[in-house]
Amino acid sequence: MKKLATFIYTLAIAASAVAQTLNVAVDNILYQFPASQTGAMPYTDGTTLTIMGKEFRVADIDNMYIDDTAVTDNSVDVVFSQSDVAITVAGNIAKYVSFTNSGAHLSIIQSADVDDAVGEIAYSLSGSSSDGELYMEGAYKCEVDLNGLTLTNTAPVYSGAAINIMNGKRVKISVKKSTVNTLTDAAG
């Protein structure tokens, strides 16, 4: 018994020496929660798991795993592919952003609760789609980084623009160095 307790203690010490991240996959969204920030994770009525204020219906979770991925707080990475979109969200802001997509047409709603305490959210956009768009609403400033994005909106779902940001505050747009970015709005 003493050997088992020593082994578990040693394993816990070794695990804490490496930055660990709890990854929660729901459809095309990967939420990444640094273990150092997660705290208590209430499991309610066998149907809901809450991590850092973000509620997940257990039935909606496709996969959960732990790895040593470094997580940048306040970041959302969006990668467009021909007919879909993959999203990675930092756990500290997971409860403040919601996503809806139809193929590569993506809508992001940033909660009205985002403020100076939460901080500015940075969205990195990359990938390529000949029929996609980004529509985003929010009431607090944000940053949108174009990081090798080719996006054409041929059949609008949310708006006619390749990127349409409706924000109550400043939106900082940046084009990452050494990248080519092409945006084409829908005809009309």
Predicted feature locations:
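Sec-dependent signal peptide recognition
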Residues: 2-10
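Boundary at the C-terminal end of the N-terminal hydrophobic targeting segment
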Residues: 17-24
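Short acidic/polar N-terminal linker immediately downstream of export determinants
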Residues: 25-30
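Short, isolated positions in well-ordered beta-strands
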Residues: 31-33, 56, 151, 180
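Structured surface patches comprising rigid loops and adjacent beta-strands/short helices at the edges
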Residues: 32-44, 57-69
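Soluble extracellular-acting proteins and domains
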Residues: 50-51
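A composition-driven surface/loop motif
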Residues: 68-188
